[in-house]
Amino acid sequence: KELDLIDEIKFVHPKDMQDGKIEITSGDITTNLPYVDGVHLAFDHHLSESIRNEKRENHIIIPTAPSAARVVFEYYGGFETFPESFAEMMVAVDKADSAQFLKEDVLEPKGWEFLSFLMDARTGLGRFREFKISNYQLMMDLIDYCKNHTIKEIFALPDVKERVELYEKYAEAAKEQIQRCATQTKNVVVLDLRGEETIYPTNRFMIYALFPTANISIHIL
């Protein structure tokens, strides 16, 4: 959007792309999604996609890149094209897409890390209330807002603030619930929430921060 190359943005599910449910034309650019024939350009960083697909000129894939956003950023010239003010945001995007969070980022999230959790549907905030605008609409708004505002200014937005307040309201209850309902066997932790009247919202990495020797989790709902 910074380069005025797009006129419409859609967020779609990877499985819907694979199943052919999303109409793709030669005027489309896809990012962080499975490759589909007929697309103009497809950007990705998943090794599985480079294995699944034969090499194509319009499939811009760098398996060593920390994020698909980084692949797009470098393809279009990096900081020779984009403003230096994007630097902090790009580091945060790399961290979120590759899940390179520190334990404290997960337990007590702040800044860009916190924003990524708030915007992730898997955090579960939507189960608790109807926000003034949907997560989808907020994502669309933030595409423009993030270009010219600091993370502090982003968190001052009313639509972001109400999500922060809800997350923090249930933060301790969510941690207690995971510790009470989870059992670990070797490197696998099973979270059984079938008997819980309320499933409290928290980021999807919390279970690994609370059970740091586990690297696989199974959720029973």
Give residue ranges: language-model regions:
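Long, charge-rich alpha-helical interaction segments
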Residues: 121-161
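A broad, low-specificity signal for short, low-complexity segments enriched in glycine/proline
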Residues: 149-153, 177-182
